[in-house]
Amino acid sequence: MGAGQSVCFPPISGPHHIGCTDVMEGHSLEGSLFRLFYPCQASEKCEQPLWIPRYEYSMGLADYLQYNKRWVGLLFNVGIGSCRLPVSWNGPFKAKESGYPLIILSHGLGGFRASYSAFCMELASRGFVVAAVEHRDQSAAATYFCKPTSQESSPAESLEEEWLPFRRIKEGEKEFHVRNPQVHQRVKECVRVLRILQDASAGKTVVNVFPGGLDLMTLKGSIDRNRVAVMGHSFGGATAVLALTQEVQFRCAIALDAWMFPLERDFYPKARGPVFFINVEKFQTVESVNLMKKICAQHEQSRIVTVLGAVHRSQTDFAFVTGNLIAKFFSSNSRGTLDPYESQEVMVRAILAFLQKHLDLKEDYDQWSSFIEGVGPSLIQGAPHYLSSL
């Protein structure tokens, strides 16, 4: 990282170089936008992508946090808009005959496709292909799609951007009636990205709206369709839980501090497992953990653990924002008593152990199997003591 970098990402510990590309498929709201992290070949020329893709995301982030969109958006853009990810932008994909396991990742409220880059980079360095979906249900800080400007079909020069802002709950609206349709749309978007990547791995042509990106044909034969997991944070955690039930190709789900509220009550008898709930100390409620326990009671391989000293945003990249000015906008909600780098390491190891077990990986991640049971640094099984009488 350069001296001016105001986001200091955790060091990568896996053996693979990491590539990264953006994929937009389709010319309508029903299409897909995601950021793909993957093992790549070493390359002498290595352009690094921006962490926050464009200025509009800085404005959207300020708006989501309920700051002045214009001025604080400008401040965010100046402070963190030039930060780059330590990966190879559109780096050459490293083919693997047996295929890489695939993870589809769903962001939380106010997130976007790069909000969990620390997790994505580390998992890609460990030999996973990770697709971070940018949802179009208006839960993202900002997002967009490219649509034709006229009735003519598809030349790139005839496309125009349509931006979708974050949608707030209006006065008098019942939040569940907004969030429940959103979580179902989110699942459809996750499944669509799964299908796109399976098509690419099968050698089918996938047209990327973005020019000059990674040729997805290079993924041919390199994704293991039998080893697929879904993962998400907060609203994305609920999305992952629902996606596991609705799409049988997902073999397991990882729910980081899942916000269970959007899921309808009659969903729980139908819920599938295994789900790995990784909570932080001070976000969950008794009711929310009770709902997680309903799923665990039905599926003996599902687990709940809590990371002590971590807070809700400890599981996002915003935990790694540094510098007095910008960090103030996140510090009250993104800094727990546990060092964010220690928190990240503990969670990654727990995730790897869970994935090894349930995707039948031939790795050494079982050295952290105890983490799945809440036995490890800063971990406890189940809920914190003040929620333990459930």
From Swiss-Prot:
Any one GO cellular component localisation term in the record: cytoplasm
Membrane topology: Lipid-anchor
Record-annotated disulphide pairs: none
Domain of life: Eukaryota
Keywords: Cytoplasm, Endoplasmic reticulum, Hydrolase, Lipid degradation, Lipid metabolism, Lipoprotein, Membrane, Myristate, Transferase
A GO molecular function held by the record: platelet-activating factor acetyltransferase activity
EC number annotated for this UniProt entry: 3.1.1.47, 2.3.1.149
GO biological process: lipid catabolic process
SUPFAM superfamilies: alpha/beta-Hydrolases
Reaction equations catalysed: a 1-O-alkyl-2-acetyl-sn-glycero-3-phosphocholine + H2O = a 1-O-alkyl-sn-glycero-3-phosphocholine + acetate + H(+); a 1-O-alkyl-2-acyl-sn-glycero-3-phosphocholine + H2O = a 1-O-alkyl-sn-glycero-3-phosphocholine + a fatty acid + H(+); 1-O-hexadecyl-2-acetyl-sn-glycero-3-phosphocholine + H2O = 1-O-hexadecyl-sn-glycero-3-phosphocholine + acetate + H(+); 1-O-hexadecyl-2-acetyl-sn-glycero-3-phosphocholine + a 1-O-(1Z-alkenyl)-sn-glycero-3-phosphoethanolamine = 1-O-(1Z-alkenyl)-2-acetyl-sn-glycero-3-phosphoethanolamine + 1-O-hexadecyl-sn-glycero-3-phosphocholine
Gene3D superfamilies given in the database record: alpha/beta hydrolase (3.40.50.1820)
Lipid moiety-binding residues (N-myristoyl glycine): G2
Chief localisation class: cytoplasm
Active site positions: S234 (nucleophile), D257 (charge relay system), H312 (charge relay system)
Subcellular location(s) per record: Cytoplasm; Membrane; Endoplasmic reticulum membrane
InterPro entries, sorted: AB_hydrolase_fold (IPR029058), PAF_acetylhydro_eukaryote (IPR016715)
Similarity field: Belongs to the serine esterase family.
Subunit-structure text: Monomer.
PANTHER family assigned: PLATELET-ACTIVATING FACTOR ACETYLHYDROLASE, PLATELET-ACTIVATING FACTOR ACETYLHYDROLASE 2, CYTOPLASMIC
Entry function: Catalyzes the hydrolyze of the acetyl group at the sn-2 position of platelet-activating factor (PAF) and its analogs, leading to their inactivation. Hydrolyzes propionyl and butyroyl moieties approximately half as effectively as PAF. Also catalyzes transacetylation of the acetyl group from platelet-activating factor (PAF) to lysoplasmalogen and to sphingosine, producing plasmalogen analogs of PAF and N-acetylsphingosine (C2-ceramide) respectively. Has a marked selectivity for phospholipids with short acyl chains at the sn-2 position.
Protein name: Platelet-activating factor acetylhydrolase 2, cytoplasmic
Protein species of origin: Mus musculus
Name of the gene encoding the protein in the UniProt record: Pafah2
